From Swiss-Prot:
InterPro entries: HCO3_transpt-like_TM_dom, HCO3_transpt_euk, PTrfase/Anion_transptr. Homodimer. The gene is Slc4a11. It comes from Mus musculus. Glycans are attached at N511, N519. It is a multi-pass membrane protein. This is Solute carrier family 4 member 11. Its main location: membrane. Keywords: Anion exchange, Cell membrane, Glycoprotein, Ion transport, Membrane, Symport, Transmembrane, Transmembrane helix, Transport. Expressed in the endothelial cells of the cornea. In the inner ear, is located in fibrocytes underlying the stria vascularis. In the kidney, is expressed in the thin descending limb of Henle loop. Belongs to the anion exchanger (TC 2.A.31) family. The chain crosses the membrane at residues 344-366, 380-393, 399-415, 429-452, 461-481, 543-564, 578-599, 628-645, 671-691, 722-746, 753-770, 775-797, 803-819, 824-844. The lineage of its organism: Eukaryota, Metazoa, Chordata, Craniata, Vertebrata. It catalyses: tetrahydroxoborate(in) + 2 Na(+)(in) = tetrahydroxoborate(out) + 2 Na(+)(out).
Length: 862
């Protein structure tokens, strides 16, 4: 059985709900190895379990190699046999095991810490650590041969060539087993060695300057822990026990990130002591979690009637959970050792452009759909006010509010109804928004956000992919309009020709003098004359269309290239991270300058702007009849369903366990706050806003510290820590509000193709981690290129494709209603989203077995 297969079976064993560990006695083997070095070699990696969101264990691998003889090599072609075995070890309990504290105290008293090790090969790193023992008087071992000790750390793999291939003899490496599969913790490696000539135990920790690739499952090593000890020791003092102590500490990904930030040995020691205190407090609590509770957490039960009462319980619990940490939302990353001012600045700039440009685009669309009742100026004002209030008072400030395409569609439907029935648009719009806020407040007080537990991961990803498609569709529609007007349309050329005729005074009354016509022609600007001269005028429209397409694709290319730049090997890591965080602002500014200044002789399509006569005007809600108010209630109810689903869905994606947020959730309070904000926006005729996808998950990603690992050639990222702050959303909202001073210029210098490129960028970046999109891509790949995901290993391939096909059908159903040309069909779009719940629970299990559905759903719910 291969190593990966064995790990997979182990993960399935523990997911069944049994806790325990396997232990093999290695003492005899270690003695034999000392007596006959080279006759028999071992490579050991130990395993352990921890309760919580997943199962953590260490892998113990023993490789036994018989030296190949020359004649045997000739017969077998250099092939040798490797025997692999594993055993499980529990994490050290710092609350109960006194030895764990003594191991750490002994290390701190005679610490051997190497910071910023520049060596790149494992041999050089270990030799540096052994030399540290030799030079340190506290670790003097007069009878120890360093060359022999170095040889014992490695195992000859039996390679027939003169250059031997080395395998570590005895190591510990952390592994996390979840329902999604097995993940190696590749940033640290604990190496164990026993030797009779050693007098006492020794521990050395080396922190590498850069991650090193030392083979499979060790592709991003930053820490090396070396444990040396004599073989004859008390059972609680063996090399394995000491290694288990330090392996337990390094199994915490947050702790490893803290160690990376330390600058001196004293800070390194302080981090070790602090981690011991945390483990002492957390171990009893962690031990109380059972595997059954973990299983329930991953697959929450549907809420019962009693869960929705008492009235307002969820709101009160949210406030009590979030209020104690409210001051920290302003100080985290600003005060203390872990400062993140630079990341806050880049994230604020990213949010500013990510919010402002869609706001301008949808504001221009609202201006066209409402005949100027809601324009760009009002849309920017509403975005700024709503964003400020939500960033200040929300329970989860990482969620970003934004007006969206479905809301623009609802606004268009309201305008059509008002025109058909001769109603006051502002009053009817206000009543629809008030009813929407009333239902949202009712949902919040009744704790209906608990119903979101019914949404499986597959359903969430269908809706998320639908939103990404709408961004792509908006960009394509905009580009089609540009080509229709400038490339194919005759109206543009006729308009240009007529402007030339009027410019020269041809066709005027007989009283017009030639002198006036000549003056008009001479006073015309060079650009205007260039665009109206022949034959260039017949091609200027085509140039506009082609340039618009290039600018849109260029904005997408530059933005996404810089976004992925942090994964490249070029420049310093800090520079790569800064460029990645500022990818969107750089792309927008660059191609705005190219479109507006690089090609001044070519006309570019810009958004429509008409300044509002009264920015804040209260709607005359008393002017409508009771019948019209009742009609607005129906629209408000359907709109509230859209708000409810979008708000809770995006909040669930932000609060997902893999994001490692620690300050708690506030679904019910945030829903009530959303109702309050939209009440004010409705009364003043400003566009509605709700939680935006993918802006909110991208906001989390921008504030996250990420650790990478490589498995089978595929790079996976794990979020280590997220700065849960209000400052970035506050700063972006303030900048959006100040953008009102930039209207009409210089904001109108941003061509529409740049906005469309932004839409494509947002859609493309939102596909990262979307399992539905990944499974659709499998249809275009050969089977040997399939990634080693959990569903590939545990679900038959035919079932995977069946499930993907059924999800695509649901996605097409959403698109049929959400993108319909009939406005009234778009209004029932929220009902279609709700209809996916019975489809998932009642229809899909009849086609695909429930056990396979659960694996592919891989439910993660806070």
């Amino acid at each position: 059985m291969s190593q990966n297969e064995h790990c997979q079976d182990s993960g399935e064993y523990f997911s069944a709900g049994t806790q325990g560990y396997f232990k093999n006695n290695m003492e005899d083997n270690l003695e034999v190895r000392e007596d006959s070095l080279g006759d028999e070699v071992f490579d050991t990696v130990n395993s352990s379990i921890v309760s919580g969101e997943s199962i953590r264990f260490f892998v113990n691998v023993n490789l036994e190699v018989q030296p190949s003889k020359s004649d045997l090599e000739a017969a077998t072609g250099g092939c040798v046999l490797l025997h692999t075995s594993r055993k499980y070890l529990k994490l050290k309990n710092f609350e109960e095991e006194v030895r764990a504290h003594r191991d750490l105290d002994g290390f701190l008293a005679q610490a051997s810490i190497i910071l910023n090790e520049t060596a790149t090969s494992l041999d050089d790193v270990l030799r540096t650590m052994l030399n540290r023992f030799a030079l340190d008087p506290n670790h003097a071992e007069p009878d120890c041969d360093l060359d022999l000790l170095m040889a014992k750390l490695f195992t000859d793999a039996g390679a027939p060539m003169e250059s031997k291939v080395h395998l570590l003899s005895d190591t510990i490496q952390g592994v996390t087993a979840t329902v999604r599969g097995v993940q190696y913790e590749q940033s640290w490696l604990c190496i164990i060695c026993t030797m009779k000539t050693l007098q006492k135990r020794h521990v050395c920790i080396s922190r590498l300057v850069r991650p090193q690739n030392w083979g499979e499952n060790s592709c991003e090593v930053r820490f090396v822990i070396l444990v040396l000890a004599p073989p004859k020791m008390k059972s609680t003092k063996t090399a394995m026990e000491v290694a288990r102590t330090f392996a337990t500490m390094f199994s915490d990904i947050t702790f490893r990130q803290k160690l990376l930030k330390t600058r001196t040995e004293e800070e390194f020691k302080e981090a070790l002591v602090h981690q011991r205190q945390l483990l002492t407090m957390m171990m009893p609590r962690a031990a109380g979690h059972s595997m059954s509770s973990l299983h329930t957490h991953r697959h929450p039960q549907p809420p019962k009637c009693k869960d929705f009462f008492p009235f307002g319980k969820g709101i009160w619990m949210d406030i009590m959970r979030r209020f104690p940490v409210y001051p920290m939302d302003f100080t985290d990353g600003i005060i203390g050792k872990s400062k993140s001012v630079g990341k806050y600045v880049t994230t604020t700039l990213f949010l500013y452009f990510a919010c402002l440009l869609p706001t301008i685009a949808f504001g221009s669309l609202n201006d066209e759909n409402t005949n100027g009742a809601i324009d760009v100026q009002k849309t920017i004002a509403g975005q700024s006010i709503g964003g400020l209030l939500y960033a200040l008072f929300s329970g989860q400030p990482l969620v970003i509010l934004l007006t969206t395409a479905p809301l623009a569609i609802y606004t268009q439907v309201i305008r059509v109804i008002c025109d058909d029935y001769n109603l006051d648009f502002n009053a009817f719009y206000a009543w629809t928004g008030l009813w929407n806020s009333f239902f949202l407040a009712l949902y919040a007080f009744l704790n209906l956000s608990l119903l979101m537990n019914l949404f499986k991961r597959s359903t969430e990803e269908i809706i998320a992919l639908f939103i990404s498609i709408t961004f792509v569709l908006d960009a394509v529609k905009g580009m089609v309009k540009i080509f229709g007007k400038y490339y194919y349309g005759h109206h543009y050329h006729t308009k240009r020709t007529s402007s030339l005729v009027s410019l020269l005074g041809i066709g005027r009354s007989p009283n017009s003098s030639l002198h006036t016509a000549l003056n008009a022609s001479l006073l015309a600007s060079p650009v205007e004359m260039a665009t109206t001269s022949s034959p260039g005028s017949t091609h200027s429209g085509q140039a506009t269309a082609v340039l618009s397409l290039l600018i849109m694709l260029g904005t997408l290319w530059l933005g996404y290239t810089l976004y992925q730049f942090k994964k490249s090997p070029y420049l310093h890591p800090c520079v790569r991270e800064t460029l990645s965080d500022c990818a969107l602002p750089i792309a927008v500014l660059s191609f705005s300058l190219i479109g507006s200044y690089g090609f001044q002789e070519i006309e570019m399509s810009k958004f429509r702007y008409n300044p509002s006569e009264s920015l804040f005007e209260v709607a005359q809600i008393h002017s409508l009849s009771f019948k019209a108010i009742g009609s607005a209630m129906g629209l408000g109810f359907l709109l509230s369903l859209l708000f409810f689903i979008e708000q809770n869905l995006v909040a669930a994606l932000v609060n997902a366990p893999e994001n490692r947020l620690v300050k708690g959730t506030a679904y019910h309070w945030d829903l009530l706050l959303l109702a309050i904000i939209n009440t004010g926006l409705s009364l003043f005729g400003l566009p509605w806003i709700h939680a935006a996808y993918p802006h909110s998950p991208l906001h989390v990603r921008a504030l996250a510290l990420v650790e990478e690992r490589v498995e089978n050639g595929h790079i996976y990222e794990t979020i280590v820590d997220v700065k849960e702050t209000r400052l970035t959303a506050l700063g972006a909202s303030v900048l959006v509000g100040l953008s009102l001073l930039l209207l009409p210029f210089p904001l109108q210098w941003i061509p529409k193709p740049v906005l469309y490129g932004l839409f494509l960028y947002i859609a493309l970046t939102s596909l990262d981690g979307n399992q539905l999109f990944s499974r659709v891509a499998l249809l275009l790949k050969e089977q040997t290129s399939y990634p080693p995901t959990h569903y590939i290993r545990r679900v038959p391939q035919r079932k995977i494709h069946y499930f993907t096909g059924l999800q695509i059908l649901q996605l097409l159903l959403l698109c049929a209603f959400g993108m319909s040309s009939l406005p009234y069909m778009k209004m029932v779009f929220p009902l279609i989203m709700i209809a996916m719940i019975p489809i998932r629970y009642n229809l899909l299990p009849r086609i695909i077995e429930a056990k396979y559905l659960d694996v592919m759903d891989a439910e993660h719910r806070p």
